[in-house]
């Protein structure tokens, strides 16, 4: 059974396909229209704007805080009663070095503020901080899926693995269309979305 959506789709497979197609097109627009350039790096309000932009054609909850508790495997994301306080604290975290930025990213992943689409929107948010603060972005096509997922799974306890992994994939090609497009495809691949190539939409 599919998540409730604006498209009236009942099949999970149909929804996954349309979600990938529509939100990847919106991700391309984000790059091309420079919307992010006007938004403050590292703030939850910016992540909200990214999430809303990507998913507003698909879900009513786009850009809105989740209203349910979420878990993945044995890991529980921030409980609803603490979510707003957690996000306020994340806003205040420093972000002047690579390590500080990744620590902030790890905390936002633990917060998992949305019902769906957290990983994809938060990776764009992370690159926006890296680009603004240290003049780098992650070349996600260089980050192995299994290594990334395992490092993120461990990151709440030990963040050294995700730091090493992402540091090795940093590039100063911050305005490269190719790096961005391949990065979106890879970001979606981590979540199991592989039907469409971003560059061809």
PLM region descriptions:
Residues 1-201:
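FIC/Doc superfamily catalytic core
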């Amino acid at each position: 059974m599919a998540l409730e959506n604006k498209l009236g789709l009942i099949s999970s497979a149909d929804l996954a396909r349309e979600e990938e197609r529509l939100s990847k097109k919106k991700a391309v627009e984000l790059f091309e229209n420079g919307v992010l350039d006007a938004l403050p790096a590292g703030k939850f309000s910016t992540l909200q704007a990214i999430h809303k932009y990507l998913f507003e054609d698909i879900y009513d909850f786009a850009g809105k805080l989740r209203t349910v508790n979420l878990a993945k495997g044995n890991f529980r994301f921030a409980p609803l009663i603490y979510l707003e306080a957690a996000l306020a604290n994340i806003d205040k975290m420093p972000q002047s070095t690579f390590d500080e930025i990744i620590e902030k990213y790890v905390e936002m992943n633990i917060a998992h503020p949305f019902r769906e689409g957290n990983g994809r929107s938060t990776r764009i948010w992370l690159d926006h901080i890296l680009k603004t603060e240290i003049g780098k972005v992650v070349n996600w096509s260089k980050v192995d899926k299994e290594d990334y997922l395992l490092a993120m799974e461990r990151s709440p306890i030990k963040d050294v693995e995700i730091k090493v992994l992402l540091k090795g994939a940093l590039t100063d090609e911050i305005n490269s269309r190719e790096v961005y497009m391949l990065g979106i495809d890879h970001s979606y691949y981590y979540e199991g979305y592989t039907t469409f190539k971003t560059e061809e939409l």
